[in-house]
Design a protein with these regions (language model features):
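Primarily secretory-pathway and cell-envelope proteins
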Residues: 20-102, 143-167
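C-terminal motif of bacterial Sec signal peptides marking the signal peptidase cleavage site
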Residues: 12-15
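Short, solvent-exposed, Trp/other aromatic-anchored flexible loops in extracytoplasmic proteins
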Residues: 101-149
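Conserved small/polar residues in nucleotide/adenosyl-binding loops
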Residues: 1-4
Length: 167
């Protein structure tokens, strides 16, 4: 009987120590829990001089107010996903790829077009895809593609990043 009580108490106590997938990410955990970003090393970012990803502010108190824009000042049209984006966190001058709670493009991989000289608002729901983020320095990354010959699927992909701080 004592053994059953001990096992029950141990189970209850260990359950109190378990973590949830949606818990707040701790900034101290970046190096231990996340991969170092391939953007900027294997994958080049912000290589287009006339297409950029910008934000309405450089600092946000919460992610609900974060607004990002895709600006095409070129004479070309580019394709992008309305749903897919990545968030990375910087710690000790190293960028880490944060883990998505789910792939936002899984249910809706709409291919969208940004025309020449167009500026579009990108309504990304960062909290839904990444959960609550601690204060820190981040960047959002999107990919765009230029189709040289759409019928042949001849295209080039470019990665755009915009840094921001979460207070």
């Amino acid at each position: 009987y004592k053994r059953q009580i001990l096992i029950t108490v141990t189970s209850i106590l260990s359950g109190c120590n378990s973590t949830s997938d949606e818990e707040i990410i701790s900034s101290q955990d970046f190096k231990e829990n996340y991969e170092v970003s391939s953007y900027g090393t294997e994958e080049k970012i912000n290589t287009l001089s006339d297409v950029e990803l910008t934000s309405s502010e450089k600092e946000y108190s919460d992610l609900e107010n974060a607004k990002f824009f895709l600006e095409n000042n070129s004479n070309k049209e580019y394709h992008y996903s309305k749903a897919y984006f990545e968030i990375e966190a910087e710690q000790s001058e190293t960028w880490y790829q944060l883990t998505q709670l789910y792939d936002p493009s899984k249910d809706n991989e709409d291919d969208a077009v940004i025309n020449s000289t167009e500026r579009l608002s990108l309504p990304f729901d960062i909290s839904s895809v990444y959960g609550e983020l601690p204060s820190g320095h981040y960047r959002i990354i999107v990919s765009i593609s230029y189709f040289e010959s759409p019928k042949d699927w001849d295209y080039d992909t470019y990665y755009l990043a915009c840094e921001f701080t979460l207070k």
